[in-house]
A protein has these predicted regions:
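Soluble "head" domains of membrane/secretory-pathway proteins
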Residues: 2-9, 24, 28-199
Length: 199
């Protein structure tokens, strides 16, 4: 059987174009992330699937880290996806402090610029503006932080399961430009099936 150019143009080319557009959109606009561990409990659990807004911190040329349009700067309390500075593995952690802020942590409890973030209304949680982080301190608080000044353009990212998270307390600060996107919502949770839980 012989295939003509007309057949290729009508049948194959549209499918190839659609595949290229879908993969480019996943690279630059939105994607999903599978949570591999419990380092973000009690906010995210192992097996959760999360929608990631890749335009939150800027619109990039597909498959690169080159910004076409600059986006918002990350804010404390946001949950972000980025590569680990230690080994390049894709991670999801909470941004707890950004450039110009000073972070301290004792027994898993965070203070930023001298203000403790522990929620009075919801014990075991921390308040980041309107965002509430439900912590897991069952394994202790992990390493402490003493007066860490965050330089401009950098940020501190830490897991909500403070005693069971390999995070910025181990590998240090990350550059804002290294963020792939902001986690928006959990869309699938083991045991519950499809859900929509905003982060």
């Amino acid at each position: 059987m012989r295939f003509s150019r007309t057949w290729f143009r009508k049948e194959v080319a549209p499918v190839l174009l659609a595949l290229v557009l879908v993969t480019a959109a996943r690279s630059s606009l939105a994607d999903h992330y599978y949570v591999p561990s419990g380092s973000m409990e009690n906010t995210l659990f192992a097996g959760d699937r999360v929608v990631v807004d890749k335009t939150a911190y800027g619109l990039r040329i597909p498959y690169t880290k080159i910004d076409m349009i600059e986006g918002a700067h990350p804010k404390p309390g946001e949950v972000a996806v980025f590569d680990s500075p230690a080994d390049g593995v894709l991670l999801i952690k909470r941004i707890v402090a950004v450039g110009g802020q000073v972070a301290t942590m004792a027994e898993g409890h965070l203070a930023v610029d001298g203000v403790a973030l522990e929620s009075r209304l919801f014990p075991g949680s921390e308040q980041f503006g309107e965002r509430l982080a439900a912590l897991n301190l069952a394994d202790g608080g992990g390493p402490s932080i003493e007066h860490l000044v965050i330089p401009a353009g950098k940020l501190l990212a830490i897991g909500d399961h403070r005693g069971n998270s390999l995070d910025g307390r181990y590998w240090g600060l990350i550059d804002e430009r290294e963020l792939y996107g902001r986690a928006v919502a959990v869309y699938f949770r083991k045991g519950d099936g499809f859900v929509w839980k905003r982060l």
